[in-house]
Amino acid sequence: MPLRSGGLDAYGATHIGKVRSVNEDQFLIASLMKLVEIEQTSLQDSDLGQLTGPGRAALLMVADGVGGLQAGEKASETALENVARYVTQTMRCYYTVDEAAEERFIEELRTAVMRTHEDVQQAGEAHPGQEGMATTLTLVNVVNRRAYVVQVGDSRCYLFRDGELSQITRDQTVAQDLVDQGVMSAVTAEHSPFSHILSSAIGGTASPEVYTLDLHTDDMLLLSTDGLTKHVSNVELREQLGSPDSAEAICNRLLQMALDDGGSDNVTVVVARVLEPPVED
């Protein structure tokens, strides 16, 4: 069911696609209101239950696993479950919009991601056939209409505001590194085999990047794995996110567009609309 708390109307969906035999993507949407209530997730038989943690907030995450057999699936599953636990603990460190508190909160988010990175590495080493498993991770923690975005890998976060679409995250791929160094053009990078090679990944070599932004009423957030952006252009994303429809309707349309264009990879989409703040008594 959609999330309609924490100041958001949010919905997520995932699909194996039309080519792959295993879905290695995962997503998670949670409200944090003195406890974490998992509203919707693709995780199977999750034992997360209710995790204590004060504060009113929302947590959105997507992950795209990498590895042979079912290792990628396990990596993305482990990452989301463990990050959810660590972020719950992190929320205790941040209650108000205070610069010093915010810096501590951001550092705690980085720590949560790096602890998860170590967990995935250890899980891979402990189970034959899962050595070297890794995953992307993109999360958005919304607290009091401020968004904290943490990214490892190339799963993206977009902001749609007043008709404009902005990519908040930077793809952590070899191709993007070459673009940043002036060695390759952005157009060439889109079709380069290096665009599929991660320069940072949970379980591999993780270098989490953190972005912060203030949110406005009717802003739209989009998190997705590359199974969406391989098939749906920025023009199409802008058109869909500009719709007044619910997050659920927009999410399902985007996923179907990727499938209709070929569905060459697993596809995972999370869409969230920022709601009008409640009237204070």
Locate each region found by the language model.
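PP2C/PPM-type serine/threonine phosphatase catalytic domain
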Residues: 1-281
